[in-house]
Curated annotation (Swiss-Prot):
<dbReference type="GO" id="GO:0099160">
    <property type="term" value="C:postsynaptic intermediate filament cytoskeleton"/>
</dbReference>
<feature type="region of interest" description="Coil 1A">
    <location>
        <begin position="99"/>
        <end position="130"/>
    </location>
</feature>
<feature type="modified residue" description="Phosphoserine">
    <location>
        <position position="535"/>
    </location>
</feature>
<feature type="modified residue" description="Phosphoserine">
    <location>
        <position position="416"/>
    </location>
</feature>
<feature type="compositionally biased region" description="Basic and acidic residues">
    <location>
        <begin position="788"/>
        <end position="834"/>
    </location>
</feature>
<feature type="modified residue" description="Phosphoserine">
    <location>
        <position position="601"/>
    </location>
</feature>
<feature type="modified residue" description="Phosphoserine">
    <location>
        <position position="667"/>
    </location>
</feature>
<feature type="repeat" description="32">
    <location>
        <begin position="708"/>
        <end position="713"/>
    </location>
</feature>
<feature type="modified residue" description="Phosphoserine">
    <location>
        <position position="727"/>
    </location>
</feature>
<feature type="region of interest" description="Linker 12">
    <location>
        <begin position="243"/>
        <end position="264"/>
    </location>
</feature>
<feature type="modified residue" description="Phosphoserine">
    <location>
        <position position="547"/>
    </location>
</feature>
<feature type="repeat" description="12">
    <location>
        <begin position="588"/>
        <end position="593"/>
    </location>
</feature>
<feature type="repeat" description="52">
    <location>
        <begin position="887"/>
        <end position="892"/>
    </location>
</feature>
<feature type="modified residue" description="Phosphoserine">
    <location>
        <position position="625"/>
    </location>
</feature>
<feature type="repeat" description="16">
    <location>
        <begin position="612"/>
        <end position="617"/>
    </location>
</feature>
<feature type="repeat" description="4">
    <location>
        <begin position="540"/>
        <end position="545"/>
    </location>
</feature>
<feature type="repeat" description="49">
    <location>
        <begin position="833"/>
        <end position="838"/>
    </location>
</feature>
Amino acid sequence: MMSFGSADALLGAPFAPLHGGGSLHYSLSRKAGPGGTRSAAGSSSGFHSWARTSVSSVSASPSRFRGAASSTDSLDTLSNGPEGCVVAAVAARSEKEQLQALNDRFAGYIDKVRQLEAHNRSLEGEAAALRQQQAGRAAMGELYEREVREMRGAVLRLGAARGQLRLEQEHLLEDIAHVRQRLDEEARQREEAEAAARALARFAQEAEAARVELQKKAQALQEECGYLRRHHQEEVGELLGQIQGCGAAQAQAQAEARDALKCDVTSALREIRAQLEGHAVQSTLQSEEWFRVRLDRLSEAAKVNTDAMRSAQEEITEYRRQLQARTTELEALKSTKESLERQRSELEDRHQADIASYQDAIQQLDSELRNTKWEMAAQLREYQDLLNVKMALDIEIAAYRKLLEGEECRIGFGPSPFSLTEGLPKIPSISTHIKVKSEEMIKVVEKSEKETVIVEGQTEEIRVTEGVTEEEDKEAQGQEGEEAEEGEEKEEEEGAAATSPPAEEAASPEKETKSRVKEEAKSPGEAKSPGEAKSPAEAKSPGEAKSPGEAKSPGEAKSPAEPKSPAEPKSPAEAKSPAEPKSPATVKSPGEAKSPSEAKSPAEAKSPAEAKSPAEAKSPAEAKSPAEAKSPAEAKSPATVKSPGEAKSPSEAKSPAEAKSPAEAKSPAEAKSPAEVKSPGEAKSPAEPKSPAEAKSPAEVKSPAEAKSPAEVKSPGEAKSPAAVKSPAEAKSPAAVKSPGEAKSPGEAKSPAEAKSPAEAKSPIEVKSPEKAKTPVKEGAKSPAEAKSPEKAKSPVKEDIKPPAEAKSPEKAKSPVKEGAKPPEKAKPLDVKSPEAQTPVQEEAKHPTDIRPPEQVKSPAKEKAKSPEKEEAKTSEKVAPKKEEVKSPVKEEVKAKEPPKKVEEEKTLPTPKTEAKESKKDEAPKEAPKPKVEEKKETPTEKPKDSTAEAKKEEAGEKKKAVASEEETPAKLGVKEEAKPKEKTETTKTEAEDTKAKEPSKPTETEKPKKEEMPAAPEKKDTKEEKTTESRKPEEKPKMEAKVKEDDKSLSKEPSKPKTEKAEKSSSTDQKESQPPEKTTEDKATKGEK
């Protein structure tokens, strides 16, 4: 096999270039097999080198062959050429060359063969070596197998040994466990033994201690025993010697012994001395040396110590310097600290002083605040007094109106349009400013109410006072009627100057007069009945259809149905709401103003509780709680309750907007509030007013307005026009109820709707009170005669019960102020109602401004003629309420609760007069008024007589005014509307002055605030007079301005004078004088507003 491979290699080697280089190597490596891979790899280097050499040799030889072939070819070409011989010769040469080349090639082949053979031999040797190696590897496999078998046996043996070891380990572990158990047992035994040993050791120690003690004792006893023995022996020897006696022998022996002893002592002493001297010398030398050494040592130590001392001294000096520096710094810091402490103490002192001063200032401010509050209360009281005076004047005016209307009915001429609306526009403008201030007052009242405590028992007292105040309101309404008549007379005079009344205004007064005539015709019993004659408000309650609301609203005045339904004009709420024009809701719904519950919420009208609660809901506690009446705000309200004028002031403050927009109050209240137009229908259909009144009546029964409305109920006209009756009661009660709600619930005044439209705030209250007033109206409507008498009796009871409402309803008086602020015409119809003294509050509410402008515009002469007596009566009444008010404010200051009671009593005092007047007026015509008089306190009977005479005078004056007012109304309305803005500005200025005057006067005394209020009132009067003058300006501006200036001067002087004098001035016969009285009334209204 190897030979074949070698031969193949030898043969194929030359041709390797043709077949490719590595065929030989491939074949060899392939044939070598797996066994010869290593040998091939090992000999690859030599083999490849040979292959390369062989290939190179072979590659050279073909070139030789190719060279020979090319030479022969060249010879062939030469021989074939034309020169054949030359070619032959050349061919011969080329053959030789070819032969030589071939020979050379052959020689080369031989050499190559030799080399290949040698190489083959070497390869055979390698192959043999490889075979040997393969055989050796087979032997190694066997060796490996043997070793593997041996190792496996060893592994088995080791496994067995391991198993044995595991068993041994387990046995050892068991032994260890046993040993541990034994160890534990031994440890326990050892511990026990140690404990026993310790116990024995302690016992041994104790025994040893006892033994030592016993040994000591024994030793002591032994010593004592030896001592005793020696002592005993000595005693025995002495005794023996004494017994034997001393012999001579013994003496000699003793002497010899003594001599011997002496000799021995001397020698001993000599020896001792010699020894001592030697010892002394040695000791001295030793001591000297010792001292010297010691001295040297000490000197060295001293030197060292001196160095240390020096360094220490230096350090000490340094430390001293540092200490001094520190001490100086410390002193400086102490000084700074002391200075800072001083500064701190000074600052603290200053701070404390500042705090004390601030506290003092706070206390002063508090005292000032309280004083201002009391002053405001006193001013409200003064305003109430003024309103009382105005109410008296209204009553007189109403009486005159009734007389005039009665005369007209008798004569038979148709009602002439009144210029009631003319004076009103001026007033509403004033009322707007009044509203602004009234809202502020209401806020103060609300604060005071918050401070007060609500007591149900007090509410009853307040109700009693409300009944009294209702009577006062009636009287005041009678006064307002008189004032309205005077105002109408003035308007007539002005109308003569300006005889261009708007058709609507002319129509409305005519309608009012017609409606009054109709009402009088309807309720001839009323006009005839002394009660009706006495209560011209009831006789005029149909006239209330004439109520300024309709008279004011020319549209309503045009609509005969509306004038016919005096309920609307009568409804003081309407008169109030016209004044409320500021409160668009009230202006829009004069019906609401009339019976806010009717127009605004029939449900409220239906729900007397709701009617009651508008103010009561707002401040039910206020309406209910005399404490609120007691509350400083209510202290003001009690004062207002005492003097409905003051109560009216908040309403007037609310009604300034109403006064500002008299036209709105006139027409907007009625035109805007179809409810009013509807309410006239209600006035027309007493059944309807009755139902709202019934719905409202529960509240009205509570409200003194009921007492007022019963009077209206007394008037058959009112029974006929229950709406009118309701409205007068409403006007009365709304005024009263509104004011109480407002006075009681400044929250209502605060309530944006109420604050915005104080008239509305009042009107909701009015809605409540109208309902109350309506309830008596319902009774009256049900049984005009019965309602008149029984309801009067009932309502007086209600009034007695309701006086709290009236006490609460100083704002009711306020709402009447709204009515007054609305239109003199409305005030006039209310005045027609006011003869009853029920409407006086309404007329007062209406007349705060309404009566004033009518007085200013219509006929100061009439006012002069009519009001002197009436005003005197009113002033007397006002003086009484003022006194009561003054008392009550003081009491309120002392105690918030007591003042309401006192206020109720005071109210009862002034109101009995008004109630007596009203009740007696009613008593003359009817017996029903008598129960009212009894319930209301049938105090003076003379006053009712006066009121009846005044009512007659008022009727006569109203008839005259109706004629003149028709002419004056159109011009006056325009003039008044122009005067409104000016009046508003003037009122605002006067109110600011009044507030300033109030603030400076801190005294708690009510008299001082009253004085301040009085000057403020003249200023307001001036503003109102200026308004009237402005209204007259189109006709007589220069003249009016001069008059206003004179009036202002007279008023500025007059404020300090008593209110009675003011009332007298208002009733003065001269126009100028009548204007100042009007100013006084206006001032009163403005004060109430404040």
